[in-house]
């Protein structure tokens, strides 16, 4: 009887430890997702995001980007 009680206690302990580890892992995944989430800043709804096809004569790229005349797509404006 004592051995059965010890085995049941160990099984319960393993279940609790596993549940807390799964919860901790999901929390870690949420934090990492938030850190590495790439969101393009868009001031206007009609602006073009990074690497979008554009017209250099009518530059509609979002703030911080400029339509490249050679490639005709929005690139980061470095200066």
Curated annotation (Swiss-Prot):
Q: Does the keyword Transmembrane helix apply?
A: no
Signal sequence: where? 1-19
- GO-annotated cellular components: extracellular region
Transmembrane residue ranges? none
Q: Which residues form the propeptide?
A: 20-45
Tissue specificity, please? Expressed by the venom gland.
Q: List the disulfide bonds.
A: 47-62, 54-67, 61-74
Intracellular or extracellular location(s): Secreted
Q: Which SUPFAM superfamilies match?
A: omega toxin-like
Question: Matching Pfam families, A to Z?
Answer: Toxin_12
Alphabetized UniProt keyword annotations: Disulfide bond, Ion channel impairing toxin, Knottin, Secreted, Signal, Toxin
Q: Does the keyword Signal apply?
A: yes
One Gene Ontology term of the molecular function aspect? ion channel inhibitor activity
Q: Cite the domain annotation text.
A: The presence of a 'disulfide through disulfide knot' structurally defines this protein as a knottin.
Please give the family membership noted in the entry.
Belongs to the neurotoxin 10 (Hwtx-1) family. 34 (Jztx-26) subfamily.
* Functional description taken from the UniProt entry: Probable ion channel inhibitor.
Protein name, UniProt field: U16-theraphotoxin-Cg1b
Q: Which organism is it from?
A: Chilobrachys guangxiensis (Chinese earth tiger tarantula)
Q: Source organism lineage?
A: Eukaryota, Metazoa, Ecdysozoa, Arthropoda, Chelicerata
